[in-house]
């Protein structure tokens, strides 16, 4: 998945949580949200989707603005989903979005029952400057794993904090996770300001928020913090803290979150997020393209999570994004690829679709890791050789074991160490690839592959 470590070129030590990390490494880590919202999950079982005319009947996607992936993160009930719905409503009035109701974003039965977001939901909208894909990340502690899959594809994040409550436990965890999975920039929305009577309280909350951002190595003093009420914007009341605040927020997102650099000149590679079967047409794999370009008619290989490491072969017969047809998909796009000759059960989340011959799979690799401290949300105690955490590599979530060097008996929280890691199944790996280690529902370490082995 991701890393918060960087090799200092002037030393052999890994530098954790450095402010230089993302400017040097970039945020190329890819892991995707549940794209069923984008590809039309409800449509997948419909007869219209299964007809041969479906792909031809969709509108064509026009690529006339930079495409940027953003998302809302923050504590449960602080208003992330309300803000997402409010953004689409306000921009729809400007002719730059389709308004999506709160219930459409929060649409899983268990979400409505519990009033929280579980699967990462997805909407699209435009500003005068950009085209945005927006992920609404869950805030409930039980679903941090889903938050990771949403956050890792963001080019920038919108951190939502309730004015009356201030930063809460999941606020802190989401800021930490945003740092770990490589979200390069954050903009903050201080929500529910209409229910705060004392303006000094908002000043204190803003001060606390800036200190928290600085603690996790974001530029807390510089990050724009927009005050407003997502509910007022959604209901069309109190224009100043409602509609105007949303427009001000989108201006801040346009200006503060830099245009992402897309890797278009490398061979095509897309980690699979989800898989659907379309009767009479084939299998659709969804995900965010990590690098390169894919065109209709091109041959691809599907690698990873297969014993023996032999790749599957297929041809891409359709490329789709936001229910619109693309002639080609390129790095940064969240797409569905229609694959010829494959069954739904042949492929799974965590595999990678790549240009034939451009990618190899490995079980064993050497990596440099930074072990998070207790204060950073990591382990309280040391670990030893044969420690078996979960490895998050792109969209794969796979068990593996740690083999420490002979001269290292144990690794303490806060340590940097070079070790050998062995996964239970092969996955595509390359030098410089970042990943996270998780155990018991928390991130305990992050690293970068230094050498692939077998």
Curated annotation (Swiss-Prot):
Species name: Arabidopsis thaliana (Mouse-ear cress)
Superkingdom of origin: Eukaryota
Spell out the residue ranges making up region: G4: 191-194
InterPro entries membership: EF-Tu_GTP-bd, EF-Tu_GTPase, EFTu-like_2, EFTU_2, G_TR_CS, P-loop_NTPase, Small_GTP-bd, T_Tr_GTP-bd_dom
What does this gene product do?
This protein promotes the GTP-dependent binding of aminoacyl-tRNA to the A-site of ribosomes during protein biosynthesis.
For this protein, the record's Gene3D superfamilies field holds: P-loop containing nucleotide triphosphate hydrolases (3.40.50.300), Translation factors (2.40.30.10)
Instruction: Give all residue intervals belonging to the tr-type G domain.
Output: 65-261
Q: Which UniProt keywords apply?
A: Elongation factor, GTP-binding, Mitochondrion, Nucleotide-binding, Phosphoprotein, Protein biosynthesis, Transit peptide
Region feature G2, mapped onto this chain: 115-119
Please give the residue ranges the record annotates as the region G5: 229-231
- What is the extent of the transit peptide? 1-51
Do you know which CDD domains this protein is assigned to?
Answer: EF_Tu, EFTU_II, EFTU_III
The segment annotated G3 runs over: 136-139
Where does the record place it? Mitochondrion
Entry-annotated residues carrying Phosphothreonine = 82
Q: Give me the gene this protein comes from.
A: TUFA
Please provide, in alphabetical order, the Gene Ontology terms of the cellular component aspect for this entry.
cytosol; mitochondrion; plant-type cell wall
An individual GO BP term: response to cadmium ion
Q: Name one GO molecular function term.
A: cobalt ion binding
- Using the UniProt annotation, give all residue ranges assigned to the region (G1): 74-81
Any idea what this protein is called? Elongation factor Tu, mitochondrial
